[in-house]
Amino acid sequence: DGNSCAPQTKQAAAAVIAAAGGRYVDLAVMAPVHPLRHRVPLLVSGPHAQAAATVLTALDMQPRVAGAEVGQASAIKMLRSVMIKGIEALTAECLLAARRAGVEAQVIASLQASDPGTDWPARSAYNLERMLVHGARRAAEMREVAATVTALGLPDGMSAATARWQDLLAATGAEPGPADLAARLDRVLARL
């Protein structure tokens, strides 16, 4: 099951499949499918994960066994998304507000001084592009992430806010255009 959903959702599906005599494997796709296609990194978990990894490897795919319990592969993907998609949402909120306030260059300079190892304009343009192109799907995933975090007994504020930002940028319908940060910010702001 390669759906991007909460571990508890996968566990419920596994119970149904097992009751019918099937073998369920939790599969998480860990990077964009394009351009790697079938060579995209995969995590598999559950009691049949090793058997699935053997079959997937024979198909020239890139599986890695994440554990013997259904939900482990999905938990890794979901919790990684708190960070990856959350950084995208922080980028959008920070730089859209900075652009609207007329202080975008100063904010980027401050970020660059704090973290000189990151090319902030390029990374920010990339993060916005990912949200504009994939925001609707990522928002749905982030709602599953929020359910994962809640099931762990923790507040889901960051994940829920990330889902809202992903939805918001997707709903603008703005085309990413060239990888020019200022122009990309302007295209989004014009539609908010």
Residue map of PLM features:
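Alpha-helix boundary/capping residues
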Residues: 17, 59, 114-118, 165, ...
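Helical "substrate-binding/catalytic lid" subdomain
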Residues: 76-178
